[in-house]
Amino acid sequence: MIKIADIKESLAGKTIAIDDVVTTYSNRESSHKAAWTYMLASQLTSIGLNAKVLTKQDNVHDFDVWMVALPMEFEGSYNLFGGANDEPAARIKRLLDYSGDVYCLNREMPNVGGFVESRLKSCSDNWKALDINRLGNICETIKTVDTSTDSTTFILGDSHSVSVFMPGANISRNDGKTLFGVMKEGMETYIPKGTEHLITYFGNIDIRHHLCRQSNPLESVKALVADYFKHLKALNINRIEVVKLLPIEFEGRRIPKTGWHKDAPFAGTQVERTQLMEVFNSEVDRLAEEYGFGVISWPSDWYDTHPELFAKKYMEKPGSVHLSREFYKYNFITNKENLSLKKTINSLF
């Protein structure tokens, strides 16, 4: 693995494409899956590089350098919703034809040739025509680039953490991680040495799946936040900011099975979880003042918005537990604070 700082000079003045070899990225701001890739582009542009996330309309051959961004949910293999047909075959062929430098962002480049071979039993003719051995050889030569910098600002959180990413900062996104779980492991195991400004964003998952299962949910949430602040204080970091939790969306919202726990999309009613969220956020405000920490809040009108409208307006489409990129704290294209957060919608009608 090489650090982005080690190759920054060689990339200066070059156009950089950020794209996967097999799958595509959407330019829709409501796409949470694409948001991580746009954040990677933000990391590169914030250090002066000319990087762009490609969509279906772009041609990677128009760019000097290709930075491969694997899908956010990638776990060693690709999901081909339409099968091994001509469309993904054409995308993979781009790697065979590409003449510029290729890197893989933050993760080891998978063997695309091996993946192609695994789908030969049911595929199109163009898929069969792909040079498996050459693909494998190319992938072996692709180096991994670590996009982290020497920034002293560090963001630690679950899958929601990308929504508070600050251009120029480093980030550790831990999908499915609860506040209870990260404290049990110890946040210090995640935080790099030299961190002077820590932003933490945990708790949405605890509210969604776990706290309503406790014998006394209200006391449990208060105890959880109290432990949270004691844990943060023990880290002895100069500046700490805690992100408040999002409003609780309506119960009819479709949640992908990846967001379920114990065969359920949530535990507790919308009203019960809203009460816990409000207590959590209230305790964050109270303890932040006591401990001298900062608080990162969401627009107050969101909490007065009808739960169904909140989901339809502010969350990822068509359904998930995440905020739409349109309402992240920063705009990843401009690297400036997001003015969309000033918009207000309060009524379902």
Put a short name on every predicted segment:
Residues 23-30, 74-82, 172-181, 205-226, ...:
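Surface-exposed cleft-lining segments at the edges of enzyme active sites
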Residues 252-299, 320-330:
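Substrate-gating cap/lid alpha-helix
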